[in-house]
UniProtKB/Swiss-Prot annotation:
SUPFAM superfamilies: Urease, gamma-subunit. GO terms for biological process: urea catabolic process. The keyword Calcium does not apply. Its EC number is 3.5.1.5. The keyword Repeat does not apply. Heterotrimer of UreA (gamma), UreB (beta) and UreC (alpha) subunits. Three heterotrimers associate to form the active enzyme. This is Urease subunit gamma. One of its GO terms (cellular component) is cytoplasm. Disulfide bonds: none annotated. Keywords: Cytoplasm, Hydrolase.
Length: 100
């Protein structure tokens, strides 16, 4: 199987997001890379599931709370940006202040 660089990136993001989700489910507070991966992977899947850009942006702000991450992480994450594949093409999605 041959994967393009973009496909490899998406797969790595998915894998990091899955690891973060497992840690979150165990009650482990997420660090910076885990929080970004968790949010970004969920945004990718939401876009793939058919949500609109606006819906994905709103959804992204509901995924993590301050209690889900280590101290100071929420203040470090000002925005999360991904290129997501929607039914009508690839679009840039930005979620501002995603950890509330």
């Amino acid at each position: 199987m041959h994967l393009t660089s973009r496909e490899q990136e998406k797969l790595m993001l998915f894998l990091a997001g899955e690891l973060a989700a497992k840690r979150k489910a165990r009650g482990v507070k997420l660090n910076y890379p885990e929080a970004i991966a968790y949010i970004a992977s969920h945004l990718q899947e939401a876009a793939r599931d058919g949500m609109s850009v606006a819906e994905v942006m709103q959804y992204g702000a509901t995924l993590l709370t301050v209690d889900d991450v280590m101290g100071g992480i929420a203040e470090m994450v000002h925005e999360v940006q991904i290129e997501a594949t929607f039914p009508d093409g690839t679009k840039l999605v930005t979620v501002h202040n995603p950890i509330r």
